[in-house]
């Protein structure tokens, strides 16, 4: 049957046209509706939001045992697909399989999930060294829930792929990843400027948690960042429609998600308020990185991971053998199965000094270096832990002590997957100021250069372990020697250069400073204190040589606090780069404050 369109009356032709357009619009709307969250990233990094982690009924029971063989077109040689479109489709398929696996092993925490892991009143907890009994006294988990957790955990560890396919990262690529969006785009850019200032050539990806974040900062992503060899990565675009449909992510999951969506194979993950003060580029070429594939840094506190987690994860801990003091190893002959013989000795030994446990100290995740190829399963399992963080794993990893959050999920995942990591041995150096009551207020954490820390550790600690005199000494004598290392060579005042300064409280934000009556001098339009004291770091500066001579390198001392304010002045007041974070601010007033601060710090830097 044929239709002669010329014979159709004009009014009917118009009706057909309108109907056709309407049908097309309905089709487009139905097939492009991805439910995403307009994320409130204002809470990122400050606290987590105790909310429902999953809003996803897509529990179809599908299991992705190991998607790599069918997803990776290169059959394992790490090359990406021939076209961007095919590569993205392949990556989306992989991530759908991963999240289907997460859904299959969804933790059921009962009708009262917030109390599935129930903290015990501190007055009722056992006191003393953090041995097994003391740790177990801090929280209660029912035997029924323990059985459920063990089954689900065993299943997800079994079903997650051992490696990620080449379609989800660019083979051989190295770079820095920072989370942006809202105020964190401002902080991320300040961190980017500092990174370039210390000489780093690494590309940078700033992760936008939602498409709304990206669209609000289109100018920032498309024009400002490329000038600094940086770009935006939009999280839902990388994961794909099938993953994002009906699924919501919370702020405490963004750090693990950033590792997932970055295109880099070799990753330095930075909190947006973390300032690099030592060029990180050489780390990816180092023996340390190639040996371990993952580098972490310590937090202030000792590990309080519950022995129950070791049961859930089926990690065997030898309760009769002490193998370390704090984060420093002790010598034990290879054939010695036990060196703890009495109940009194057992009570005196911290649980995390035992063979099979995770070594001290707890981990501070403001910076993390990791290889996406060798440690892909660690990243995936850490993401799983963060899905059930606030009500489950954060509690099992902290037991109500300070520092609860995502920080220990990465090391725990590495131990479960049996993938190596090196944790820096040097203790955090705290920077701050004395307030009007002469009370010290900490504002930032200084972490040490991992390469020099490792060299220091090899030259002092590991070298001592090779000496026959040390091998023949008692455990008690060995501990005394390790205490000296702890208090002298690796304490917060050691000589190992800084790597980062984590400016987490308060953050480097002039808008925030002006709202703080305890910090801001309204009359003088400047801060009342030098917040970072006399913090200086060493920077190498290349000097042009005279005619016929080679350029030389000088080492200069940089006033950290003054430099950050100079960066703010350049970004906001001279270049006038736009940030949505300051949309409601009078920029003239803000820049007057910044100008006053630069002038005041310049006079007081000596």
From Swiss-Prot:
Residues 36-606 are extracellular. The chain crosses the membrane at residues 15-35. One of its GO terms (cellular component) is Golgi membrane. Its main location: Golgi. InterPro entries: Alpha_mannosyltransferase, Nucleotide-diphossugar_trans. It is a single-pass type II membrane protein. Keywords: Golgi apparatus, Membrane, Signal-anchor, Transferase, Transmembrane, Transmembrane helix. Pathway: Protein modification; protein glycosylation. It is found in: Golgi apparatus membrane. Disruption phenotype: Leads to hypersensitivity to toxic ergosterol analog, amphotericin B, calcofluor white, and to thermosensitivity. Residues 62-78 have a biased composition (Basic and acidic residues). One of its GO terms (biological process) is mannan biosynthetic process. It is an enzyme of class 2 (transferase). Its EC number is 2.4.1.-. Residues 1-14 are cytoplasmic. Residues 59-86 are annotated as: Disordered. GO terms for molecular function: alpha-1,2-mannosyltransferase activity. Belongs to the MNN1/MNT family. Alpha-1,2-mannosyltransferase required for cell wall integrity. Responsible for addition of the first alpha-1,2-linked mannose to form the branches on the mannan backbone of oligosaccharides. Addition of alpha-1,2-mannose is required for stabilization of the alpha-1,6-mannose backbone and hence regulates mannan fibril length; and is important for both immune recognition and virulence. This is Alpha-1,2-mannosyltransferase MNN23. It comes from Candida albicans (strain SC5314 / ATCC MYA-2876) (Yeast). The lineage of its organism: Eukaryota, Fungi, Dikarya, Ascomycota, Saccharomycotina. The gene is MNN23.
